[in-house]
Amino acid sequence: MGRQVPSESLSLSEGCEVEISYKNNGNESVWYKAILEAKPNSIFKEELSVRLLKDDFSTPLNELRHKVLIRPIPPTNVQACIDIEIGTFVDADYKDAWWAGFVVKVIDDDKFWVCFDSPPDIIQFDRNHLRPTLEWVDEKIYSWWIIGSTRNSEFLKRLAEEPMFSPGTIVELCSKRDEGEVVWVPALVYKEFKENDEYRYIVKDKPLIGRSYKSRPSKTVDLRSLRPIPPPIRVKEYRLDEYIEVYHDGIGWRQGRVVKSEGGVMGSLFQNWCTLLLEATKKQLMFKQSDLRPLRVWEDGVWKTRESSLTQGSGDKTEVETQRKTFPKKTLPRNQNGSGNDSTLENENSNRKRKREENLCSGSSVEETNILFEKKLPVWKILESMEVFKTIPQSPHFRPLAEIREDSREMLAVGMMLTFSCLLEQVKALQHDEARSSFISLSNSFAELEKHGFNAQVAQLRINKLLTLRGMQSRKMDELKGAKKVTAEKESVKVENERKILELQRLNEEMAKEIAQSMSCEGKILQQLDNMKLEFQATASAPWPKWAFRST
């Protein structure tokens, strides 16, 4: 049960602002802002109509009463009654109505991604456009608001399982074009649900450059149609016959092969250009190197690199060709009306997390590191024996060091390993009253190490959680200051009231004395009146004197 706040009674008088919710609009969790008005040309004075404040849509109240819920406008201070974190149920101010949803991502202290279930959508909101979920209870003689403070337990339970594609995750969506070409398009996951014991996802792909997600219809796909955003790799120069992906015409990432590489000048900047052979169309086009990235295949929860034919033997080439041919088939979305072959999908899903973790310790990164430098320093054995690297195994590739002098690479790599260890200790030593800049600095340092292949996800998640808690603590401190201010004001009023009470007591004591004096005077007067009464009666009843009747 949430917190209860007294509510004003619902008034159905003309001009009153209310909130209404349609039962037949497909979503009963939307509360529209409306106003009650007199119905035009009505012969009944009590007949009113509801007008939505933005759309000027008017419907007679007596026709809507069985279709709509009506409640008063909630108090304006309910926004201060909510602590927002991942999973918190909220109402969001959107399109002149309050829509029910839950938070899937905390951007910072004042910006949040909110997920809506019907229709599926994710929208960013500022804190001042969010409020807690509200329930209005009306008992005729008394009414109140119930302020909810619950979290989406189902979403949090699923999030604890570390799903690869939870709502709010930016991914790449497999899209099939003409001639069977497979293109990977940036997309956003809006909803995850289970159907026939298989997870499915509602996503919206990113359209042509310059347009937003909202302009595209949503799609329902399975796990094999999605992959995470590949980690960035800095490439100084692409080799001939190297397989790459290019973001072309806003369509998405298309596969190609380098057939020519050269430098050129654009304006005042020197640019590297590559001529590519697009595999699907067999057309040769020229692209800036900044528009390219190495081709990697997402398979069994790990990224696999597709090597060029010049860097491997004939046996490897056959293996790569086999991989290339099976890759589109492996990643194409299924026909939603077809049955598909799902015999191995459940096993693949259950083993995906395990294989991804095993890949962190695989030998592929070690081989690439050995190409950059040879581990000659004895400090490597010390590093490998450190508890921190046993708890959080690391296998950095150090690829950016390829641009550094070879004799300096190993020392820089050792320095990064030590830096990673020290940063973890700094995270554990963070205090609740430290400056926000300390948290941001640590996060940026981990981000730099991630460019060299370090797995800092756990540390980054902890920093984000600590930042969220710190933001909540900061808001609570502000609330505490406000509460202390109110307490001080109330104490001041109490002291003033006590002073007034003492003054009234003094006045009452003086008044009591005056009353006593007045009562004493009153007693004397009463005594005098009694004496006069007796004298009057004695006088009136006295016998007449005999002399009064003597004749002269």
Swiss-Prot record:
It comes from the Eukaryota. Keywords: Growth regulation, Transport. The gene is DUF10. Residues 371-543 form the DUF724 domain. The keyword Flavoprotein does not apply. Residues 308-361 are annotated as: Disordered. Pfam families: Agenet, DUF724. Residues 333-348 have a biased composition (Polar residues). It comes from Arabidopsis thaliana. May be involved in the polar growth of plant cells via transportation of RNAs. Expressed at low levels in leaves, stems, flowers and siliques. This is DUF724 domain-containing protein 10.
